[in-house]
Amino acid sequence: MNSCSVKQRPIRAVIFDCDGTLVDSEVPAMDVLHEMATAAGLRLTRNEAHAQFRGVRMADIMTWIAARVPHKPAHFEADFIKSYRETSTERFKESLSPMPGAVELVSSLKIPFGVATNGPREKVQLTLDLTGLLPFVGDRIFSAYDHGSFKPDPALFLLAARTLGQEPQYCAVVEDSVPGLLAGVAAGMHVFSLHGRIGVPEEICERVHFITALSDLNSWF
């Protein structure tokens, strides 16, 4: 991304993803999915599971897993999701941290910001609370489950922008997954990625500013 274009369109609001962006919950959540998928009979490595599931809505993950599990018991999908929610919640309570620089960033922002996520509101509130971020975010949580629009659909970001009182072109999106990056680009927003270039569609790379840490954002807003 051309940094000059970002500076020419001032950033007046920020929309963060949650898992893997503000909260270091992506890895433990993906690990739980990997453990449960392999226990159900799938043969995939931890790295393959992370690549397959990261940033993908749970319904699509469940469809992918169920299609590969032979001789499924009745209510397999509902039971799997219930067990995943319970197990991941316990894992979060055992050990969960904010992403490096997250508290410092959100506590010092002078422009409106919120969190837009493909995760359920209850889970997001829990992880933000466990990491000390919830007081800064407040009720500015936009869950795809509440609004029926999941990334890469840009609708959730556009809703967040309207609620924050800004036009899309003056909003920044901070993401760590390909579906989130696609949604941010489609929304016409400034897009910052904690996800490396590998695996990001080439056609959007020129519209994404790749960063290595949240502290890199200090010079932008």
Where are each of the predicted segments found?
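Metal-dependent phosphoesterase signature
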Residues: A39, I65-E104
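Short helix-capping segments at alpha-helix termini
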Residues: A39-R43, V69-H75, G132-F136, G165-Q166
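Hydrophobic residues in well-ordered beta-strands that form the structural core
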Residues: D24, V115-T117, S193
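A short, glycine- and basic residue-enriched loop/turn
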Residues: D19, E26, N47, L96-M99, ...
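Active-site neighborhood of HAD-like aspartate-dependent phosphohydrolases
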Residues: N2-A51
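Short beta->alpha linker loops
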Residues: P28, F53-R57, S97-G101, G119, ...
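Asp-based, Mg2+/Mn2+-dependent phosphohydrolase catalytic module
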Residues: M1-R12, S107, I111, P120-F221
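Helix-loop "lid/cap" segments that line or gate small-molecule binding pockets
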Residues: H34-A37, R57-K72, T127, A161
